[in-house]
Amino acid sequence: CSKAVDNLADRLQFDGFEDDTFEFQTMFDQNNPDIFFDDAMLSALISSCCFVLVTRGAGKMPEGQQRIRFQIIDGSNATGIIDDYTKLLTEGYAVLDRDENDNVKSWAYCTPGRTEVYVAEQPDKPIAVETFDSPYCALVPIIYRPDAKRQFGHSRISRACMDYAKSAMRTIKRSEIAAEFYSFPQKYATGLSDDAEMLNSWHASMSAMLTFTKDEDGERPTLGQFQAASFTPHLEQLKAIASMFAGETGLTLDDLGFFTSNPSSAEAIKAGHEGLRLTATKAQRCFSV
């Protein structure tokens, strides 16, 4: 499923802010701009949304401006009540830190114009409070493909993608089990005397030389080998699952490692990625960049 996320994320690019009246670019440059956008978009594609907690940073800029801190929080560690019109939060909650046992150590509760930070040792009283003039929370959602029913969007890893990945894993496991049989095809011997010593199956498989004698009637035993199982059915099933996964995600079989004997032309490659290009264009609009 990482292919479905990474191939789309690689096509998203942040160019900057237009009509930057409020100097967003200055605040953005204070928060590791080289990886901030990629981190936020990748998190939103995986969990359908992520959140950016805006707080005051320590110290001031050389120009005397207050430092602003942007903290990315994945969708599994934050939630809130979303405004149907602006798609911003009117109330939000975010986990800030966890211990080694995944227990919550600190969290933030956000309301319009106010952010309160709590810790597990003192859950009833905030240890820090920030106030500001805004009709919305300082917890800002970044949502991928929202709709009227699912306002917090859809994950790039759909249920169909997960089902195809599980089917592919089962196919690979079956092929590994079958490999033990077609690597050592089963053998047989007929016409042995009733008094002949029975061979241990493991000893017979691993021995370099075996001795068979004629029976009491002078007949020689007949040795044979069953036809080895083929890996082809497993490979064909895996390729069929890959085709369904590619159709679900807008990828091509080449993207998934199934290369054809005749390389595709530039036009064919472009046509194969047309669906992914449209998905990336839609994602750009969803993220408002």
Residue ranges, per PLM feature:
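Extended, charged amphipathic alpha-helical segments
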Residues: 128-275
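Structured, mid-chain assembly/scaffold modules that mediate subunit interfaces
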Residues: 1-144
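Surface-exposed beta-strand edges and their flanking turn/coil or helix-capping segments
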Residues: 83-88, 120-123, 183, 237-240, ...
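Short amphipathic alpha-helical segments
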Residues: 20, 29-36, 160, 164, ...
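Glycine-rich and small/hydrophobic secondary-structure elements
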Residues: 272-289
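Hydrophobic transmembrane alpha-helix bundles
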Residues: 94, 221, 288-289
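General N-terminal targeting signals
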Residues: 41, 45, 53-54, 185, ...
